[in-house]
């Protein structure tokens, strides 16, 4: 996703919260993006760890959308580093919510 697509998604998309994630989405092309804010995690090592965990959780759970395509932007809102199981559970819940719509 490029900056223009992200801004359009933030303006026109819907939002779902499942701690520690805030997910903006809309039906569309099937693009995926995510962000871990620098203001919450100063060290790049921590941000990269969380980005790897979110990316892997999405990759493993993407099949829950049942072939429907959404533009999805995941924003990590937690203040602490959560373990992979917590992130995976949150991503699975979000994708189940989207599939049910």
Q: What residue spans do the PLM features occupy?
A:
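Positively charged, solvent-exposed patches that mediate nucleic-acid binding
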Residues: 1-101
């Amino acid at each position: 996703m490029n900056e223009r697509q992200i801004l359009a998604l933030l303006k026109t998309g819907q939002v779902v919260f499942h701690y520690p994630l805030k997910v903006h989405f809309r039906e569309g092309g099937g693009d995926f993006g995510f962000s871990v804010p620098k203001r919450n995690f100063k060290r790049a090592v921590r941000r990269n760890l969380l980005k790897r965990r979110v990316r892997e959780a999405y990759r493993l759970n993407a099949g829950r959308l049942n072939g429907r395509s959404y533009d999805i932007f995941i924003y990590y809102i937690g203040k602490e580093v959560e373990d992979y199981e917590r992130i995976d559970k949150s991503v699975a819940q979000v994708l189940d919510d989207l599939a049910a719509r």
